[in-house]
């Protein structure tokens, strides 16, 4: 499970991870990926369509999760997963035999805001990004993870 605020590098990490043979067949669960497909299909920006497609993206996410879980496939959760409550809810849906790992992305607020400025069509209002930064709780093994890894940006 990837954990970190927007702009921290989670999706870039997934792209690199998928090139490693062990992870190449893993199912990547990402509402952002679904939204990006709709961006391409509709020729609009992420921000322009977000409110219109987030419910569909969430449904697609759940369908993909259930299929992957039922098939026993490796799953990479590519979402913010900012709080203990959010992560525990997701972990509770996994069968007990699943190996549970958390990779969290440590980034300064200044760097996140700087990166946010360069995101064309996917800009997050500063107030929201700041709120998410302050909401973020570093994952621990007490939440049910077998291991926790930090990636410092």
Name these PLM-found stretches:
Residues 9:
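Conserved glycine(s) of the Walker
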Residues 2:
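Hydrophobic anchor at the beta1->P-loop junction of P-loop NTPases
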Residues 5-6:
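The conserved Walker
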Residues 12-73, 111-113:
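Conserved substrate/cofactor phosphate-moiety recognition/catalytic segment
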């Amino acid at each position: 499970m990837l954990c970190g605020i927007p702009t921290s590098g989670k999706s870039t990490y997934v792209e690199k991870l998928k090139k490693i043979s062990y992870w190449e067949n893993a199912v990547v669960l990402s509402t952002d990926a679904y939204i990006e497909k709709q961006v391409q299909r509709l020729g609009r920006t992420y921000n322009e369509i977000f409110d219109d497609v987030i419910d569909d993206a969430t449904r697609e996410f759940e369908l993909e999760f259930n299929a992957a879980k039922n098939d026993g496939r490796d799953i990479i959760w590519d979402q913010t997963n900012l709080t203990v409550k959010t992560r525990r809810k997701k972990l509770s849906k996994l069968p007990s035999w699943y190996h549970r790992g958390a990779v969290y992305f440590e980034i300064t607020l200044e760097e996140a805001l700087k990166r946010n400025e360069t995101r064309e069509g996917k800009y997050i209002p500063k107030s929201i990004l700041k709120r998410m930064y302050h909401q973020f709780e570093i994952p621990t093994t007490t939440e049910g993870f077998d291991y926790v890894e930090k990636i410092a940006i």
